[in-house]
Amino acid sequence: MSAKIQKTDAEWKALLTEKGAEPVAFNVTRHAATERPFTGKYEDNYAEGTYRCICCDAELFDSSTKFDAGCGWPSFSQEVKEGAIEEHVDKAHGMTRTETVCANCGAHLGHVFPDGPTPTGLRYCMNSASLDFKPR
C-alpha cells in the first residue's frame, strides 16, 4: 500500500521546519535514519495523551500503551488503531527487522519487535523525532 499523502523532499523539509520539528526529523522520517538512543524528547515522557506522526498529524499511539523497554527509544505495545501503521521488511545493516511507517504519509517511525509485554507481545520502538505528542 502506498502512502495517501505524498510530497517532494523540499515540501517535507519545509513542513517540518514550519512545525518546529527537531533537525533530525527529516532524515528520520523521509530517509529512515535513526536518532541516537536516549536522546529523543519522548523517551522519558509518561504524560497522558496521544502520539501523532510529526509529518501528517495522524494518531499513532496512546500513552496508555507506552512502556520503558530500556532500549533508549519510546516504546509502545500497540498502535492506537489497526491500520495506523504499516510494516515492511527491512534488511539494512546486515539484519532483518520489521520497519514501521505511518500508513497515512509513509514517514519512517522505527521498528517493531516480538519482545514486548502482554497482551500483544510487541514492542514498537519509535524515534522521538518522528512523533508529536498531544497531551490530554
Swiss-Prot record:
UniProt keyword list: Metal-binding, Oxidoreductase, Zinc
Cofactor(s) for this UniProt protein: Zn(2+)
Cofactor note: Binds 1 zinc ion per subunit. The zinc ion is important for the structural integrity of the protein.
A biological-process GO annotation: protein repair
Residues annotated as catalytic: C125
Superkingdom classification of source: Bacteria
UniProt xrefs under InterPro entries: Met_Sox_Rdtase_MsrB, Met_Sox_Rdtase_MsrB_dom, Mss4-like_sf
Gene Ontology MF terms: peptide-methionine (R)-S-oxide reductase activity; zinc ion binding
A GO CC annotation given for this chain: cytoplasm
Domain MsrB: 9-136
Catalytic activity, reaction form: L-methionyl-[protein] + [thioredoxin]-disulfide + H2O = L-methionyl-(R)-S-oxide-[protein] + [thioredoxin]-dithiol
Positions with a binding annotation for Zn(2+): C53, C56, C102, C105
Enzyme Commission number, as recorded: 1.8.4.12
HAMAP family: MsrB
Family label: Belongs to the MsrB Met sulfoxide reductase family.
Protein name, entry field: Peptide methionine sulfoxide reductase MsrB
